[in-house]
Amino acid sequence: MATEQTAITRATFDEVILPVYAPADFIPVKGKGSRVWDQQGKEYIDFAGGIAVTALGHCHPALVEALKSQGETLWHTSNVFTNEPALCLGRKLIDATFAERVLFMNSGTEANETAFKLARHYACVRHSPFKTKIIAFQNAFHGRSLFTVSVGGQPKYSDGFGPKPADIIHVPFNDLHAVKAVMDDHTCAVVVEPIQGEGGVQAATPEFLKGLRDLCDKHQALLVFDEVQCGMGRTGDLFAYMHYGVTPDILTSAKALGGGFPVSAMLTTQEIASAFHVGSHGSTYGGNPLACAVAGAAFDIINTPEVLQGIHTKRQQFVQHLQAIDEQFDIFSDIRGMGLLIGAELKPKYKGRARDFLYAGAEAGVMVLNAGADVMRFAPSLVVEEADINEGMQRFAQAVGKVVA
């Protein structure tokens, strides 16, 4: 909120925040559903969703009520004590998935850090202290801590911070032969996003994930699914593993889990969880009542046939608009993804210009994302209305027209 002494503008960002982001020139101040307004009152249609976070749009009444109600009851206890919202949310996740145990954290990075530590510790105590190899994939993204950014397969994020955690191997995504070539009995885990979000909205093939499951079983390694971006209804199933019919040993969830309130979770089986003991891992804020109350309300809405089945129809509407834009301007070489995580790859003549289309979209009143320099990404609310899709994509078409003119 602006103070009486100093007005808050985009320039304020450059004066007070570390230069690790390059935010848009406008500052959003209000949101409702799939609409956002900036300081000047300009309206935007939001197809970015806070990077696949605001799964029920902005200020959904059920989430607002959950936050208000819990905010008047209990905010924080730490994990010296437990709390009802965390236990209720944990039960909901376990009842709806393969998991038997859950640990709450605050971000996707923390959930993945937990998963990777557990995978290595489980291998150490159940098998051998030398079973430490983690196999991950090129162009993957698993977070920003030193461990998670090292497991992620993008040197632009991991280089320049000194020695990295050892025994992490990266191979091409969707290449089962490459995995077989490096996998052995020293492998503790294979870590994969069923859909690489930051890596260009690339979906794994069913054969690839099933092959990973078989290899993990053969070598007594754990299969870890990072569903931070593609989980919680984004694909049209509650979690992407359900679409593929491949069950992981560990699954991580964040982003849409809280509908905009920071919360994450690592899900696993009782057997694997038992490798941890009191003090093995933890978080001061993880599983706090405010976050879990909001996440519980979001879960109750997302995990319904009405919402999950509607995602497929909404996806088709987006794809039809993108196909029409491509017919008019000839800019996309591929339209891909799953559910409401959609990628549109730019043709070679527009290579490297995804940010140009993003900025033009904002100017036209629509918020979109890029996934690398060559892919436009759409991750709207799972309950975005048809009218918002139509109007927002019309605005995006206008933006495309200006860029290619």
UniProtKB/Swiss-Prot annotation:
Cited CDD domains: OAT_like (cd00610)
One Pfam short name: Aminotran_3
Cofactor remark: Binds 1 pyridoxal phosphate per subunit.
Name by which UniProt lists this protein: Acetylornithine/succinyldiaminopimelate aminotransferase
Subunit structure of this chain's protein: Homodimer.
Note: The reaction catalyzed by ACOAT is highly reversible. This enzyme may also transaminate ornithine.
Residues that, per the record, bind N(2)-acetyl-L-ornithine: 144, 283
Localization per record: Cytoplasm
One GO BP annotation of this record: L-arginine biosynthetic process
Encoding gene, per UniProt annotation: argD
Molecular-function GO terms, alphabetical: identical protein binding; N2-acetyl-L-ornithine:2-oxoglutarate 5-aminotransferase activity; pyridoxal phosphate binding; succinyldiaminopimelate transaminase activity
Chief localization: cytoplasm
Residues that, per the record, bind pyridoxal 5'-phosphate: 108-109, 141, 226-229, 284
Substrates-to-products reaction catalysed: N(2)-acetyl-L-ornithine + 2-oxoglutarate = N-acetyl-L-glutamate 5-semialdehyde + L-glutamate; N-succinyl-(2S,6S)-2,6-diaminopimelate + 2-oxoglutarate = (S)-2-succinylamino-6-oxoheptanedioate + L-glutamate
